[in-house]
């Protein structure tokens, strides 16, 4: 049985989004590394969800949610309250494996990537409030 054209288009769009996401994440990793951070994990998956990037610097664990869109503003709007809760829970799951557990120094950032590939990092951008 052959796929319907609409299904093929959806599969193609999904593949394009996947590769665009990988490219955006690679740009963000380079940006952090240029500021002395050490890359640890990409698309780290826990039981609750996934964290796009995990980096370290001087004992600090940084969890990064990467959002790509036509503009920084549009990218920033793509983070829902449900997604924030999932990111926090997944980050807590990650640090539970650390020697200091939940006492580990950690930060939750958002990295925005626009259509031109420019990167804007918003440190500590996710708040539980």
UniProtKB/Swiss-Prot annotation:
One of its GO terms (molecular function) is nucleic acid binding. InterPro entries: Restrct_endonuc-II-like, tRNA_endonuc-like_dom_sf, UPF0102_YraN-like. It holds the Pfam family UPF0102. Belongs to the UPF0102 family. This is UPF0102 protein RD1_1191. It comes from Roseobacter denitrificans (strain ATCC 33942 / OCh 114) (Erythrobacter sp. (strain OCh 114)).
């Amino acid at each position: 049985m052959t796929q319907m054209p609409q299904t093929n288009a959806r599969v193609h769009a999904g593949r394009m989004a996947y590769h665009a996401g990988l490219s955006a994440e690679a740009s963000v990793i380079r940006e952090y590394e240029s500021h002395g951070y050490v890359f640890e994990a990409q698309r780290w998956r826990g039981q609750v969800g996934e964290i796009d990037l995990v980096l370290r610097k001087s004992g600090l664990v940084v969890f990064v949610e990467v959002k790509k869109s036509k503009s920084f503003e549009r990218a920033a709007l793509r983070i829902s309250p449900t997604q924030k809760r999932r990111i926090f829970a997944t980050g807590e799951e990650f640090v539970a494996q650390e020697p200091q557990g939940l006492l580990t120094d950690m930060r939750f950032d958002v990295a925005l990537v626009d259509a031109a590939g420019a990167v804007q990092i918003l440190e500590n951008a996710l708040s539980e409030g």
